[in-house]
Amino acid sequence: MPRVKRGVQARARHKKVLKQAKGYYGARSRVYRVAFQAVTKAGQYAYRDRRAKKRQFRQLWIARINAASRQNGLSYSRFINGLKKASIEIDRKILADIAVFDKAAFAVLVEKAKAAL
């Protein structure tokens, strides 16, 4: 059985990790062992934060809707309840956009929610 030297594969693997660690500070971008740890941890953070981002945006939308609905004399929970009773199905992302960019249309929605309560 011939001898197998795995230098080529090791070099390729190291290059791949060091390429991913490009831009990191100090040894994290130069030393394979440290770079591998940094890249692995970065991947864990990225995985976690892709999920956290969804929660954070929903919080932001709710805060914006709450602020806008309170300016029109209705709390967030009563506003959402009123929309459900009026069978108006608009998701929070779109409601937040309307609240920020089209205050008149949002005021109409608030009035419809008030009427349905």
From Swiss-Prot:
SUPFAM superfamilies (alphabetical): Ribosomal protein L20 (SSF74731)
One GO cellular component term: ribonucleoprotein complex
Stored HAMAP family: Ribosomal_bL20
UniProt GO MF annotations: rRNA binding; structural constituent of ribosome
Job description of the protein: Binds directly to 23S ribosomal RNA and is necessary for the in vitro assembly process of the 50S ribosomal subunit. It is not involved in the protein synthesizing functions of that subunit.
Keywords, comma-separated and alphabetical: Ribonucleoprotein, Ribosomal protein, RNA-binding, rRNA-binding
A Gene Ontology biological process term: translation
UniProt name for this protein: Large ribosomal subunit protein bL20
Pfam families the UniProt entry points to: Ribosomal_L20 (PF00453)
NCBIfam families noted in UniProt: rplT_bact (TIGR01032)
Organism name: Vibrio campbellii (strain ATCC BAA-1116)
InterPro entries in UniProt: Ribosomal_bL20, RIBOSOMAL_L20_CS, Ribosomal_protein_bL20_C
UniProt similarity note: Belongs to the bacterial ribosomal protein bL20 family.
